[in-house]
UniProtKB/Swiss-Prot annotation:
The organism's place on the tree of life at top rank: Bacteria
Gene Ontology cellular component annotations, sorted alphabetically: plasma membrane
Stated name of the protein: Uncharacterized lipoprotein aq_1806
Protein's cellular compartments: Cell membrane
Species name: Aquifex aeolicus (strain VF5)
GO molecular function: electron transfer activity; heme binding; metal ion binding
N-palmitoyl cysteine: lipidated positions: 18
Keyword Cytoplasm: no
Amino acid sequence: MKGKILFALFLSAGVIACQPASQAAKQQEVKVAKAETKTKKKESKAEKFRKALAAQDKWQKACSNPVQIAPEGVDVAQFIKEMKATIKYPEDGNVVGDWRKGESLALLKKEYKALYGKKGGSKKGNCYACHCGDPRIIACGNIGPSLRGYGNKGIDPKMTYERIYNPWSQVPCSTMFRFGYHGLLTPEEIADIVAYLHDPESPINK
């Protein structure tokens, strides 16, 4: 009997001693699984972006000649008509959303942090890679036209929306990303960026 009690005590001690190691192993497994999931999500987003830009539909093929101004062998009026037909609008029909959300989409995380000292920003728009806009952001691109004071130029917000959704609906073979056409931005996100460009309270127009 005494031997059985001692055996039970030793067994209990062994189980207790093993628990922390077992829990640590499980925690490590959870961490690894989370890290792998995060990596897969990043890869899937990057892959989606690469596929979108490399998609060779008939229009992309027509614009693949780097020295041409208009699509080769295509009626320009028909080209623009078909590009306009691809444009989808927000469910509520409003092409002007929330400029603050638009600003967060337009700025990279590091740009947002530098301006406001808190988390925000996104890789989705990255507008300042090609444009200047907010005068506080000095490191900006010049591939596209300046966006400073954009809301004071009398441009129809719907035209701005369409230009972002599918630039080829206005300028065939434009080098600007077709954000909506390729699904890089949702209609609602594009509406928020339109607000960022047009709203009088936006830093773009200050």
